[in-house]
Regions:
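His/Asp/Glu-enriched, well-ordered alpha-helical/loop segment
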Residues: 100-102, 252-256, 316, 326-412
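Divalent metal-dependent hydrolysis catalytic cores, especially in the metallo-beta-lactamase
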Residues: 113-141, 157-167, 215-228, 256, ...
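C-terminal cap of metal-dependent C-N hydrolases
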Residues: 380, 386, 399-443
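Metal-associated gating/positioning segment near the N- to mid-region
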Residues: 74-153, 174-175, 241, 265, ...
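Histidine/acidic-residue-rich catalytic or RNA/ligand-binding cores of hydrolases
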Residues: 91-94, 144, 173-175, 228-230, ...
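Histidine-rich, glycine-flanked metal-binding segment
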Residues: 32, 36-77, 100
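Active-site gating loops and adjacent loop-to-helix segments of metal-dependent hydrolytic enzymes
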Residues: 88-110, 171-191, 226-238, 295-328
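Histidine/acidic residue-rich metal-binding segments in metalloenzymes
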Residues: 146, 201-299, 326-345, 392
Length: 456
């Protein structure tokens, strides 16, 4: 990378490099992915002023006085997006230690840890995330809302966040925070204020309660999960009537709906109800994928989550091992079928199941199952922007859009793992990172106990 002309920088107290609002910056690289094209643009140039892109193209003439950053043999790209994260939760270590930690760790401590996870994520090149669930046993705190607001105010360095707060699910289901514990250990049954519902009326109350408390998107569990003790992985957990109420109330309030779903029947009923995305989708059959295609529903496959769980399978109880293996064995065929059928695929990882900041490993998993590298890049840029409802301002390198820009070495269409070596991150015109990443804390880079609720 070469920096030419005089580069005036201000180091903010949180370590973000900011430029004066009227200063023009030119970013150059041998290649550029604009977020939509089927091939890379050669000799890419992006001109930034303030928080916006003011010009972009190949071999652009750089305005006089602009500060130039030339990355050489590298590729510019829109900032990546991850449509399935849990930034306020910790990733899974030993399952039994995690269960104990759920009862002993202060939620305030997790809020502080979340700031570390947020920074690790944005420094990895992910400038936007859809954070789809934040809950703690016995607590009604909205930590994800607080983290989003702190990032928006510039108090914390992190990605742009769209948050789902607690998530919605059935009594005894995947999202029930008391499930798997002794009856009434917490003094009461979970209710709609915890996201737990047992009727269409409960669903509407829960949606309204979460929107009232800051939800940008609504998340629900419509089938069992891998990392929950008291359910089967593919059983339906909401009735068709409850799912209809979920979609109707959420869309009435102009919120999109993402549903955790492994099972085929639950996926089919959710798609028919009109949800916006299916998260995981492990056991979906071709007939259900056809319905998905016809409805325009997105698939967020979260391949990295199942990959991580299988690599640590001995850390889980036997019942969870059986569920994990079943989901893992089914997901590859489902994903290949989705590719063949032209299903809309978004990039989402389930970060928290694995260490935060390793999100980009999802790219290699997708290409390993047959997706082309350029299409994989598109999932994390323009596809995610469409799903998240922010395509008018982010997701592509276009004049007038927010200056969320990253650089990675070499050519990611020749070596997709280049996405794991992002060297430069700009978010809304501010440089978050330029050069090697700072050493990660133990909380991000090693295997401490996961003190989250089940998320997969």
């Amino acid at each position: 990378m070469r920096i030419t002309s005089r580069l005036v920088v201000v180091f903010l107290c949180l370590g973000v490099t900011a430029y004066a609002a009227d200063e023009m910056i030119a970013l150059k690289a041998e290649r550029m992915f604009d977020g939509t094209s089927k091939t890379l643009v050669q000799h890419g140039v992006v001109i930034v002023q303030g928080n916006k892109i003011v010009d972009v193209g190949s071999n652009l003439t750089i305005p006089n006085g602009a500060q130039v950053i030339d990355f050489g043999d590298a590729t510019l790209s829109p900032g990546f997006m991850d449509a399935h994260t849990h930034l306020t939760l910790d990733f899974t270590g030993n399952f039994n230690e995690r269960r104990l930690a759920e009862l002993t760790t202060n939620v305030s401590e997790m809020a502080i840890r979340a700031t570390v996870f947020a920074r690790a994520t944005v420094e990895a090149g992910f400038t936007t995330v859809r954070d789809v669930g934040s809950r703690y046993v016995g607590s009604r705190e909205f930590v994800d809302v607080a983290l989003r607001n702190a990032i928006n105010k510039g108090l914390v360095v992190g990605p742009r966040m769209l948050v789902a707060t607690k998530g919605i699910g059935a009594t005894g289901g995947h999202f029930d925070p008391t499930s798997g514990y002794r009856d009434l250990l917490f003094g009461r049954e979970a209710d709609y204020t915890d996201g737990i519902v047992d009727s269409p009326e409960d669903v509407r109350k829960a949606v309204r309660f979460e929107v009232k408390n800051g939800a940008d998107v609504i998340k629900a569990a419509v089938s069992g999960g891998v990392l929950s003790l008291a359910d089967e992985v593919d059983t339906p957990q909401l009735t068709p009537g409850e799912m209809a109420a979920l979609v109707d109330e959420s869309h009435r309030l102009r919120k999109k709906v993402a549903v955790h779903c492994h099972g085929d029947q639950a996926a089919r009923e959710a798609i028919e109800a009109g949800v916006d995305s299916i998260e995981h989708g492990s056991f979906m059959k071709p007939e259900t994928l056809t319905l998905m295609k016809n409805k325009g529903t997105y698939l967020t496959p979260t391949l990295m989550a199942s990959e991580w769980i299988m690599s640590k399978i001995d850390n889980y109880p036997p019942a969870l091992q059986l569920k994990a293996r079943a989901a893992y064995n089914a997901r590859s065929e489902m994903f290949r079928n989705a590719l063949k059928m032209g299903i809309k695929i978004s990039f989402g990882t389930d970060a928290a199941v694995f260490p935060h900041g390793q999100n980009a490993k999802e790219f290699a998993l997708m290409t390993g199952l047959g997706m082309t590298p350029i299409d994989a890049l598109r999932t994390a840029t323009s596809n995610d922007a469409e799903l998240l409802g922010i395509a008018q301002k982010a997701g592509t390198l276009e004049k007038g859009k927010l200056a969320d820009i990253i650089a990675m070495p070499g050519d990611p269409t020749a070596d997709i793992t280049a996405t794991e070596r992002v060297s430069f991150v700009m978010k809304e015109g501010k440089i978050i990172r330029n050069g090697p990443r700072a050493p990660q804390s133990a909380a991000v880079s090693s295997d401490p106990p996961d003190i989250s609720m089940p998320v997969d």
